[in-house]
Design a protein with these regions (language model features):
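Detector for C-terminal structural segments
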Residues: 2, 42-43, 214, 288, ...
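Surface-exposed binding/hinge segments that line
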Residues: 43, 110, 144-189
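Short, well-ordered beta-strand elements
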Residues: 44-54, 96, 106-109, 128-132, ...
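N-terminal lobe/hinge region of extracytoplasmic solute-binding protein
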Residues: 51-102, 133, 203
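Aromatic- and charge-enriched surface segment that lines or borders ligand/interaction sites
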Residues: 96-141, 164, 248-251, 309-311
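Alpha-helical secondary-structure segments
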Residues: 124-131, 162-166, 206-207, 234-236, ...
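Gly/Pro-rich hinge or "lid" segments in bacterial periplasmic/extracellular proteins
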Residues: 179-232, 236, 365-366, 370, ...
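Ligand-site clamp/hinge motif
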Residues: 196, 225-270, 423-425, 431
Length: 613
């Protein structure tokens, strides 16, 4: 379904004149919700019910890194700059427009007047200033998004509608994206903001806010009547917990819930011909991988965790990678419902996807055995190699007990590693435990996966040495405990490169470096397998519009625009949720300004520029 969300032109311009003109165009094209929010959904409006099969780590946006929680929090908090549903393009979020200085180091964001938090308090630039500075000044609040601010020198609210972010150097990524802004009047007086659960009667800026959460009852969210784009057409979103995906699928069949995501291929195929149910295999923005512990260290370089020391040897890590047949896992476990992988950036982002046939660590057990032989790992009489201390080379493989594909993959991986003389013990744990253990280095191998955002900067940033956590797991977040100063330099180069072609090449080089370090064996890019009750709901907005996903979007769009069957004629454009006048003004305004914008763009020749589990 094509979204009705307003999608103004990109607003990243070096010319303040052009930015101002486009800001005007965007303001005219967007709904008049900032001035007069729509009334809340009617009392009889349904709530959208989704299956919750993954773990919630915390609903604190400064700390949460699990994918399931991120899906919840994206409905509650907006960043300054959002990603649109049409093509993951930059669109207004909490800010209505933005501009940069000529040297690219000063970004000025303008917030509209009259927008409100869900409790009725005004949204101001001071909220954004407090959020950014809280992360910059408190190491305990850096876990989720600290790496996004590596180049930020200062953040200041000049007045209630103007926020200025000053960078130490120009950077390619818009500093207003990704980071959720929280209400200062709720968070500033907390004695321990890092320990705040944020799980009851919360306050947000997005289309829905959390009313309550507990592990047994799930998450209950209600529509935000003050949402600046206009209130949603549903009363809220409820995340109903199920022990596993089989139970969730049965609940979808009986009508207990409306949407299930994270389906296994077998479940997806079984639902394809079910009456009143529609399936969607969206192009995935996630990669599936096996993380390999290279010797975890804390932020100050102190060894931590209980990883097998043999994995500190690059030859062993590379041999492990070569022993794993990703093509077989894609065909047998995923039933082909995905794409072959190279690096960490999926094919859905062609600007940064590492498209190469030169993969020296592809499946090759003979080469893996030769590598281990040459590295001095002798084969024992029982077919298990000996490490450098003369002990059998045995590794632990950890996965999530909530994901059936993890055990299925482990059943393949164990004998494959045996073929190269490595014994493997397999243990499936709760998702939260897998996260905790992997964070502090208590693993050898583990199944992992990350949802990737439209810009690769964050994903690359969590591979820097500075992304390593404290000994207790607090502080920064590291993808796989990788640290290489040469990679850090490459990250900084792509981070600051404003030429798109050059930056794309640097991003691909960075993926190549991670690949050859063999700390992350990327297996495949899985399609997002979802199903919903089409007897109750009109087709959902997908992101991107062509072949995209319903759940796990970079934004709230599918939930915000959810429309019960029979009400599609009332949906109209989002701008129409307040009044037809708003829509007419928006369209007319955009047309009137278009000529001015085109003129300014031609005249100034301003260059435009273009997300763990």
């Amino acid at each position: 379904m094509t979204p009705n969300i307003p999608h103004p032109p990109r607003l990243r311009f070096r010319s303040s004149t052009a930015a101002a003109a486009l800001g005007l165009a965007a303001a005219l094209a967007l709904p008049a919700a900032a001035a007069a929010p729509a009334a809340a959904a009617e009392d009889n409006a349904p709530a959208l019910k989704l299956a919750l099969t993954g773990d919630i780590d915390t609903l604190n946006p400064f700390i949460s890194i699990l994918a399931t929680t991120s899906n919840v929090l994206r409905l509650q908090y907006e960043p300054l700059v959002a990603y649109g549903a049409e093509a993951n393009e930059e669109i207004p979020g909490m800010a209505e427009s933005w501009e940069t200085s000529e040297d690219g180091t000063v970004w000025t964001f303008t917030l509209p007047e009259g927008t409100k938090w869900s409790d009725g308090e005004p949204i101001t630039a001071e909220d954004a200033e407090w959020t950014y500075n809280a992360i910059l000044d408190n190491d305990d609040l850096k876990q989720a998004n600290g790496s996004l601010l590596s180049s930020v020198e200062s953040v200041e609210a000049e007045d209630e509608t103007t926020l200025v972010i000053t960078l130490s150097e120009a950077q390619a990524v818009n500093p207003g994206t990704e980071l959720p802004i929280v209400p200062e009047h709720v968070w500033a007086d907390l004695e321990d903001p890092a320990g705040y659960g944020n799980d009851k009667d919360t306050v947000g800026s997005g289309p829905f806010v959390v009313d309550s959460y507990d592990k047994a009852a799930g998450v209950t969210m209600s529509a935000n009547p003050n949402y600046w784009r206009g209130a949603a057409k549903i009363s809220g979103v409820t995340w109903v917990p199920y022990k596993n995906s089989d139970a969730a699928v049965q609940a979808l069949r009986t009508g207990e819930i409306d949407i299930v995501s994270g389906l296994t291929p077998a479940q997806f195929q079984a639902l394809e011909n079910e009456p009143n149910i529609t399936t969607n295999a969206g192009t995935g923005r996630r990669y599936q991988a096996i993380g390999i512990n290279p010797g975890a260290q804390t932020a100050d370089g102190t060894p931590m965790g209980d990883g097998n020391p043999a994995l500190q040897d690059l030859a062993v890590r590379q041999a492990v990678a070569m022993a794993i047949d990703s093509d077989t896992l894609l065909a047998k476990v995923l039933q082909g419902l995905g794409d072959k992988a190279t690096g960490e950036i999926p094919m859905t982002y062609p600007l940064y996807h590492w498209d190469t046939d030169e993969l020296p660590l592809a499946y090759n057990p003979d080469a893996a055995n030769k590598l281990l032989d040459e590295a001095g790992y002798e084969m024992g009489a029982d077919g298990i190699r000996l490490d450098k201390e003369g002990k059998p080379l045995s590794l632990r493989l950890m996965g999530r007990n909530s994901d059936p594909t993890h055990q299925q993959m482990a059943d393949y991986v164990k004998p494959w590693l045996r073929e190269i003389g490595i014994d493997t013990s397999v243990e499936m744990k709760a998702a939260a435990q897998v996260n905790d253990d992997s964070t502090v280095g208590n693993y050898d191998l583990y199944f992992t996966g990350w949802g990737i955002g439209p810009d690769p900067d964050y994903q690359l940033s969590i591979n820097q040495c500075s992304s390593r956590p404290n000994a207790d797991g607090t502080g920064a977040t590291s993808e796989n405990n990788y640290c290489d100063p040469a990679f850090d330099e490459l990250f900084k180069a792509q981070h600051a490169e404003l030429d798109q072609e050059k930056r794309s090449e640097l991003v691909m080089q960075a993926q190549d470096m991670i690949y050859n370090a063999a700390v992350n064996k990327v297996l495949y890019y899985a399609n997002s397998l979802e199903a919903y009750r089409s007897d109750r709901w009109e087709p959902f907005v997908t992101q991107p519009a062509e072949g995209g996903v319903i759940t796990s979007q970079n934004g709230p769009w599918s939930y915000y625009e959810a429309t019960p069957v029979g009400e599609l004629s009332d949906a109209g454009a989002v701008a129409d949720s307040n009044s037809n006048t708003g829509l007419v003004i928006g369209v007319a305004g955009a047309v009137l300004v278009a000529g001015l914008v085109a003129f300014l763009l031609i005249r100034r020749r301003s260059a435009t520029a273009d997300d763990r589990e």
